[in-house]
């Protein structure tokens, strides 16, 4: 048996928790290397175990997962009798597949120290080494992981009916599908706890209606815990989820002044590097080489999925063979995401995960040494979560955000106000135009070799610009300050994209590149064959490229102006309609006018009658629902 964690007068000793933790939990914590609780665990675990609803805000990487898993497990194993078959005792909801998988894995690792639960989770298939048998009356925790994309709802239900789990770890959509089955039960007699992990992101990602439907299927007499790194920014929505006088736990980190003014771990050093647009990607290699020892796990954040697709082909050429670069974004197929994620976390060589904000929240990627934000996030809330992928669980980490000279440097003051201060990157990195030119030449060489990569680059650049233009700190990240030519060259583009926003650009849209576009080919033979066929058809029909360009130009309207244009068209249409109606009315006889007025009156009366009937039906349905519920509390009506 592993030695117990150190005890004593410290309130952060595992055996100092009240109510006391089970012996097997203490053994698990010691064996897993957790000698004492983190501040958030010391605050949240006793409250959640003492039947309190909790809202927990703590810095990323502070141990929030065990803060809810331990109370959930302890609660279910202290019931007077086992939970009935096909009844659920606890639910843990996560915003992403990856985070749900990690929560499930941590829970399984914890339950491996509880023999009855371990035997139920992994029944022995080896007759030579059978697991011990336990009576059916033995209390145990049996979890099930629900993920869309890897299994079908029917397969999930089949697994549920076969194994009868009492804890569900799931993303919102797949959970709702399972709870909709008449074979799945969550009565007040068995359901104990609900956990929303990364709670504010669950609300931000469009899960409001799904969560509303889930909560309506759960009993009101339950314990609820909400955990996140930035709960305070979504409190107005979260407090309406159905918590009963929740206790708010907020754990912050002392800054250099000794004041609790930081929202990131003390072990995480957050820095910024000012670099001209043309030197941005060339600077990445300098950053990697200046960090000692060489980072084994690095994450590069960019703003869009298209950016990941394009840069995953370009950056390996600029960084050399010393690092394995692995792409990951939300539009990848589920199996591709899982495969690439596993490649990164299991790599024994220096590896870089090139990703979007899909990896910014909740993912417990072990031993991340360095985070580089190539693109500052459009939503400032994401900044802390991106940085927090490094410096987890007390491990030292470094984060760097790249900023353009000028107005973007005001982002440093902006972050300080948000209690996420950054300092200049050290050691000082110098840039040369020769380095930038060499990086551009390397990228363009790859683009010239395959027209498909050129297409990807054009799409990526447009999507990057649109993300930049929607930055919430728009007074800092201003489109009018962008150096288009420098950006295009840094990306290795052969020309600037045909964007309505560049219609009045007077610079060099060719970026100094002279190219025979008719003979610029795709590597893929089928795509190249199709391109040549279209080119031939255009030549035979007499449709020249310039005519095509003019037609597209007249049809193209800046996406930022489309709403205004539609409103103008609608207004003109209404004015024209009013004018036409007035002329028609003047041509009518008195008898015709009387018939029109009578018809309009009848239509209005019918409309009012229908509205009254709908109002009465809603009132009756509401009254019936209240009677069936038999509860004098307000029904949960959603977040808005």
Curated annotation (Swiss-Prot):
UniProt gene name: spb4
Domain Helicase ATP-binding residue range list: 45-249
Annotated positions binding ATP: 58-65
Motif (Q motif): 14-42
Database matches in PROSITE patterns: DEAD_ATP_HELICASE, HELICASE_ATP_BIND_1, HELICASE_CTER, Q_MOTIF
Domain Helicase C-terminal: 283-437
Ranges of biased composition (kind: Basic and acidic residues): 583-595
Assigned GO CC terms: 90S preribosome; nucleolus; nucleoplasm; preribosome, large subunit precursor
Organism: Neosartorya fischeri (strain ATCC 1020 / DSM 3700 / CBS 544.65 / FGSC A1164 / JCM 1740 / NRRL 181 / WB 181) (Aspergillus fischerianus)
Enzyme class: hydrolase
Disordered: region residues: 531-595, 607-640
InterPro entries in alphabetical order: CTT_SPB4, DEAD/DEAH_box_helicase_dom, Helicase_ATP-bd, Helicase_C-like, P-loop_NTPase, RNA-helicase_DEAD-box_CS, RNA_helicase_DEAD_Q_motif, SPB4-like_CTE
Name by which UniProt lists this protein: ATP-dependent rRNA helicase spb4
Subcellular location: Nucleus, Nucleolus
Domain notes: The Q motif is unique to and characteristic of the DEAD box family of RNA helicases and controls ATP binding and hydrolysis.
A matching Pfam family: DEAD
The family this protein is said to belong to: Belongs to the DEAD box helicase family. DDX55/SPB4 subfamily.
């Amino acid at each position: 048996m592993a030695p117990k964690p150190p005890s004593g007068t410290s309130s952060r000793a595992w055996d100092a928790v009240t109510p006391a933790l089970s012996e097997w939990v203490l053994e698990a914590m010691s064996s897993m290397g957790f000698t004492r609780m983190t501040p958030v665990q010391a605050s949240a675990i006793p409250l959640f175990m003492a039947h309190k609803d909790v809202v927990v805000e703590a810095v990323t990487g502070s141990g929030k997962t065990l803060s809810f898993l331990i109370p959930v497990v302890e609660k279910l194993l202290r019931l007077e009798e086992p939970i009935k078959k096909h009844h659920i005792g606890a639910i843990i909801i996560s915003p992403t597949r990856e985070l749900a998988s990690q929560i499930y894995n941590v829970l399984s690792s914890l339950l491996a120290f509880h023999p009855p639960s371990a035997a139920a989770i992994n029944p022995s298939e080896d007759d030579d080494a059978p697991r011990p048998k336990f009576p059916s009356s033995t209390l145990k925790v049996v979890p099930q992981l629900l993920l869309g994309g890897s299994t079908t709802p029917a397969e999930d239900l089949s697994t549920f009916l076969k194994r009868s789990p009492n804890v569900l770890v799931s993303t919102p959509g797949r959970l709702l599908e399972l709870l909709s089955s008449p074979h799945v039960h969550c009565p007040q007699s068995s359901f104990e706890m609900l956990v929303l992990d990364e709670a504010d992101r669950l609300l931000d990602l469009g899960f409001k209606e799904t969560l509303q439907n889930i909560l309506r299927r759960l009993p009101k007499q339950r314990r609820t815990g909400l955990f996140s790194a930035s709960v305070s920014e979504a409190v107005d929505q979260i407090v309406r989820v159905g918590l009963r006088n929740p206790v708010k736990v907020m754990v912050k980190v002392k800054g250099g002044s000794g004041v609790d003014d930081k929202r990131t771990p003390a072990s995480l050093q957050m820095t910024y590097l000012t670099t001209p647009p043309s030197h941005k990607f060339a600077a990445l290699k300098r950053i990697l080489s200046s960090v000692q020892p060489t980072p084994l796990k690095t994450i590069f954040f960019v703003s869009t999925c298209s950016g990941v697709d394009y840069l995953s082909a370009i950056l390996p050429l600029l960084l050399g063979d010393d690092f394995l670069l692995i792409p990951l974004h939300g539009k990848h197929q589920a199996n591709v995401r899982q495969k690439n994620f596993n490649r990164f976390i299991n790599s024994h060589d220096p590896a870089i995960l090139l990703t979007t904000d899909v990896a910014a929240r909740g993912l417990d990627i072990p031993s991340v040494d360095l985070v580089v934000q190539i693109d500052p996030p459009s939503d400032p809330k994401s900044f802390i979560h991106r940085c927090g992928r490094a410096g987890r669980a007390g491990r030292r980490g470094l984060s760097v955000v790249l900023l353009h000279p000028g107005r973007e440097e005001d982002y440093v003051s902006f972050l300080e106000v948000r209690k996420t201060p950054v300092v200049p990157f050290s050691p000082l990195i110098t840039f040369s135009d020769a380095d930038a030119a060499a990086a551009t030449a390397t990228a363009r060489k790859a683009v010239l070799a395959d027209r498909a990569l050129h297409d990807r680059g054009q799409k990526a650049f447009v999507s990057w610009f649109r993300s930049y233009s929607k930055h919430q700190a728009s007074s800092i990240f201003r489109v009018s300050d962008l150096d288009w030519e420098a950006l295009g060259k840094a990306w290795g583009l052969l020309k600037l994209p045909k964007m309505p926003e560049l219609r009045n650009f007077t610079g060099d849209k060719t970026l100094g590149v002279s190219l025979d576009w008719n003979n610029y080919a795709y590597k893929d033979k089928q795509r190249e064959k199709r391109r040549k066929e279209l080119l031939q058809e255009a030549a035979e029909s007499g449709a020249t490229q310039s005519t095509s360009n003019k037609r597209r130009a007249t049809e193209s309207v800046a996406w930022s102006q489309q709403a205004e244009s539609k409103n103008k068209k609608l207004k003109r249409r209404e004015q024209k309609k009013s004018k036409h109606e007035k002329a028609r009315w003047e041509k009518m006889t008195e008898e015709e006018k009387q018939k029109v007025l009578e018809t309009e009156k009848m239509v209005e009366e019918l409309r009012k009658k229908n509205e009254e009937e709908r109002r009465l039906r809603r009132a009756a349905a509401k009254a019936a629902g209240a009677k069936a519920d038999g509860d004098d509390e307000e029904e949960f009506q959603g977040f808005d």
